């Protein structure tokens, strides 16, 4: 969430910045609520001071042998007024907090202003797009012909947007995840982490999925008097980042760099009719996630580095890609700046997103109270959090199947994956 003090003191500037994201901040409502908050705060403090002053006079009256009943009655009346004002203030603060939780992050000044994905800006391309001397097949046809992708059985067992993988294609899917983890842990300095696949509401609130995006989640257990509800993770970003929730990290331990390979679960609310064929948009998919916790002054350099770590996966696999910086109107709710990496898919004759790398600055950290303390600092300060896919495993499999297909329908195994597949050079 945004800094409440900044929001109050820079209301017009905040509204102007948020408008570039297509978010309309109700300035008039917030201004009225803020005036009411100030008034209630002053009234509460004055009542408290009056009650304290009169309470002190009780002892003096007793010492003089005076009747203290009228004073006691006055104290009681002030106490009732104070309780009423406190309750009113608490209700107002709850309303202000709910508004604050619904407001997206401010875009960084370096993010291009634009209304939607058509105004994203390409920053670089890598690799050469292969010319095929035959009609290319998409990953669905390739996978089904090889007996490695079974959509029909998945629909029968569960429903649409699920997959069963078998044989060497399932093995390649596993190999891709292992390769990614090995690359990030041995060359990029991340610590491999095993995390829960179920998270509570505090965790989802901390990373920004709640309260705004509850419909995108698979909820497995409702909240009860005994405890919070649990939901399946939409991304390992949630448990990885929440490791720092309500924690103060020593400056010497920064940066913290974590990676995890997990299944991810998304309802894909609002995606009806989009990417209904194949593995591009699934309710359950695997992803290798990258998370960094850094000092504020290091976060933009960390974003460039993290994006490079995700790009390196594609480079080692020999898959052409392009990287774009998202415009303000296309950024995620909690992001201040995002790079999307898009891999080339021959069957679609276009680039498709395979990774989104974002700097959240202190947006998540403020929600989570994730802080660090410098050796010479009197107080701890908020961390900056970053995350990105390194990569989405299913979409990477799609890219390998399509880019490495041969005319006879077989798939050449990329060299970097062969050690993970027992030296296998070709599928089919």
Curated annotation (Swiss-Prot):
Catalytic activities: tRNA(Ser) + L-serine + ATP = L-seryl-tRNA(Ser) + AMP + diphosphate + H(+); tRNA(Sec) + L-serine + ATP = L-seryl-tRNA(Sec) + AMP + diphosphate + H(+)
Source species, domain of life: Bacteria
Catalytic class of the enzyme: ligase
Listed GO biological process terms: selenocysteine biosynthetic process; seryl-tRNA aminoacylation
Keywords, ordered alphabetically: Aminoacyl-tRNA synthetase, ATP-binding, Cytoplasm, Ligase, Nucleotide-binding, Protein biosynthesis
Chief subcellular location: cytoplasm
One Gene Ontology CC term in the entry: cytoplasm
HAMAP family, per database record: Ser_tRNA_synth_type1
PANTHER family given in the database record: SERINE--TRNA LIGASE (PTHR43697:SF1), SERYL-TRNA SYNTHETASE (PTHR43697)
Function: Catalyzes the attachment of serine to tRNA(Ser). Is also able to aminoacylate tRNA(Sec) with serine, to form the misacylated tRNA L-seryl-tRNA(Sec), which will be further converted into selenocysteinyl-tRNA(Sec).
Record's comment describing the protein's domains: Consists of two distinct domains, a catalytic core and a N-terminal extension that is involved in tRNA binding.
Protein name (database record): Serine--tRNA ligase
Organism from which the protein derives: Shewanella woodyi (strain ATCC 51908 / MS32)
